[in-house]
A protein has these predicted regions:
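Nucleotidyltransferase catalytic core that binds NTPs
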Residues: 1-102
Length: 102
């Protein structure tokens, strides 16, 4: 069975840290979907469409990475995609505790 992970975030902007997480995730998962989420509480630097295009350009030669815009609940988006895993980055124990609570 194909192991598909969703890497959700606002990615405004998509950083080298985000790229590192995706690249490391590709050693574990068959496919990663980068979910560019709408966050009405954040004033964005880039439009969601521009964020999607920029990330697609980074991974244009890698069929294992797909980039999709979404709004709504991340869990619903996971089910819609058939993703079995969430890929998350953690900078410290505070991030870990926050993610664990979700």
């Amino acid at each position: 069975m194909e192991r598909v992970a969703l890497f959700p975030g606002s990615f405004d902007p998509f950083t080298m840290g985000h790229k590192s997480i995706v690249d490391q995730g590709l050693t574990i998962f068959d496919r990663i979907i980068v979910g560019v989420g709408a966050n009405s509480e954040k004033a964005g630097l880039l439009t969601p469409q521009n964020r999607v295009r920029l990330i697609e350009d980074i991974y244009k030669d890698n069929d294992a990475v797909e980039v999709r815009y979404y709004h709504g609940l991340t869990g619903d988006f996971c089910r819609e995609l058939g993703a079995q895993f969430l890929l998350r980055g953690m900078r410290n124990t505070v991030d870990y505790e926050y993610e664990r609570g979700m």
